[in-house]
């Protein structure tokens, strides 16, 4: 990774995210130091308006680590994300996820500060710091000033009997070049039917507006992250295109079966894996792999996991969480 890269190395023209100028990066060392060593009484974290995967594997870990230094922490993020911020007061913004960009998003530092100050005025907050994505703009800022604190997400399962595979079929029309990451419904239907023919028990997760569930699959999609974590907790594996819900599964300690059109995308999950759960690759050259190919990897992965965990009676993650801020 380049020393001052804000996000990983996407191909040229693909990174729809705010790009920091060199002068901006240098100027941000001072506010990082002030907030790190002389924090105010309260903290506004956000507004966060980036990708769900970045919120899971980067942002919320930093916010949790800062929480102990403040009397109160107010997080401004997308609706439905309260579960990620225990001990914080969560507020929603109205930024359209489909137009927010990639990585940490398109908001520039000035606009981010305006929105944070407006929220502070709205709730009558004084003596506050603003922790936003600009303070994480390079690996040096993260390494010098910030730490992450991850917790293992666990909830009681939704069913008494474990589900072999929990799918996430991405289906969001997002502005930018990643629209091709969606798995076509026809392929999802075929994959689910092939799995059922092999005797596998299945379910689907995801936001109802941004994911697809075949008609013959148990529908556990929800806007409530707590319920989604409960659904993941019911599964033995989670399978899907390499996107936010796959990162969520890793934070739940669940093995994942991924596909993506580039290996560098798979590498994200291999590095962003604080609990070191097993990760299997169904395809690293396509977001739309053939259902038969995915099925073969699913079957092989379940067999390997059964042997590794004494027929799923032992956990397959490690504690404590490993640092991944600059991974």
Please identify what each model-predicted range represents.
Residues 24-123, 227-230, 245-248:
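Active-site and donor-binding regions of nucleotide-sugar-utilizing enzymes
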Residues 82-89, 208-217, 248-250, 267-273:
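Short loop/helix-cap segments at secondary-structure boundaries that form the rim of catalytic
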Residues 77-83, 205-211, 243-244, 262-264:
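Short, polar loop motifs at secondary-structure junctions
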Residues 78, 162-175, 181-228:
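Catalytic donor nucleotide-activated moiety binding site of glycosyltransferases and closely related
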Residues 233-239:
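Acidic donor-binding loop of glycosyltransferase active sites
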Residues 104-166:
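A nucleotide-sugar donor-handling region in carbohydrate enzymes
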Residues 1-37, 316-327:
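Membrane-proximal basic amphipathic "stem/tether" segments
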Residues 247-327:
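Nucleotide-sugar donor-binding patch of glycosyltransferase catalytic domains
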